[in-house]
Amino acid sequence: MKTQKPILSALLVLMLASACGQAVTPTIEADPPTQTVTLPTAATQPSPVPTRTLTLPGAPTSTPTATPLPSELALDPDEWKSWPVQPILTSRIAEIYARGQELGNDPNAFSIFGDCQSKPEVFMGVYETDPDVIAALPAQLQETVANFTGSFNRESPTVKDATTVAGLLNPIWHEGKYTCTLDESPVECELRIHNPSFVFINTGTHWITRNQEYLETIIQQLLEAGVVPILATKADDRYQGEKTNQALANMAAKYGLPLWNYWAAALVLPEHGLYTKEGQGGLGDVYLTDQAILIYRLSALQALDSVWRAATGQ
């Protein structure tokens, strides 16, 4: 897939702060649930070697039936705060996936587009590095982990501190690492080197006014490549994070895409599961607490599980 020249011709390099810190971040413009999630108690939270399973209400606990999926979400994007934590599944997922299989996408690979909260040590790397954590999962989720082994704990050109949707479209952002070239954006490079069938879009935010436009550009690239996007809402309000979540809901409704509503999952946590890291007071509460990380990881894995099974007709 070729980089969109009209977009790249407008790229500028500016200093800005994302949800993870400050970085030289490329930008593409001149303009400046009703579902309840129960937090595990101290008695039920996994220890470093988990002895029991953390289960979130609404999570898949058995193999889905063959009931036909709806063709659209039938949810109001303006009411995204009341959307369930786990994605509403539509028939669109299987259609996108089928196209990807025709194009040769790897059915055992997923990618992540995100900032510091998407690094393997914070996000889902543990599902590849800690056998005890894996063994504590329900059998269905263990099957999902096995299917996608090799994707949970990898570094990539699309995961980096301060990554935004603007950065993902700029060849400068990958710094020429991971065999990426200056003729391809981080998105294009990741699709080439990892060839995923699914992608979590879990990026940070900044002040620019055209986030939704850039988000839609990325979504269209993924759809053209037959890759199923899994959109992820954010818990913090850094740079008006609710506007970012609104844009994600708009895109989910427009294209019939799965949305993992982590914002809703974090509602039960003190301070929304966020804290200010020492020495980084200027960023505010943007880092996940230990309690939040437990829910963050598990609810993401559950989302991957349900979307994968919808895509493959399980």
For each of these PLM feature ranges, what is it?
Residues 1-105, 113, 122, 132, ...:
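Intrinsically disordered, low-complexity Ser/Thr/Pro-rich tracts
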Residues 83, 87, 104-108, 177-185, ...:
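Soluble non-cytosolic domains of exported or imported proteins
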Residues 90-94, 188, 212-219, 245-249, ...:
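Extracytoplasmic/secreted envelope proteins and their assembly/folding machinery
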Residues 103-212, 284-285:
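Conserved SGNH/GDSL esterase-like catalytic core that processes O-acyl groups on lipids
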Residues 106-109, 194-200, 223-230, 255-258:
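Loop/turn elements at helix/coil->beta-strand transitions in domains of secreted/extracellular proteins
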Residues 120-122, 208-213, 232, 238-243, ...:
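Extracytoplasmic/secreted cell-surface and envelope-processing proteins
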Residues 200, 204-206, 216-248:
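Active-site segments of SGNH/GDSL-like serine hydrolases
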Residues 238-314:
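Catalytic His-Asp segment of secreted/periplasmic serine-dependent ester chemistry enzymes
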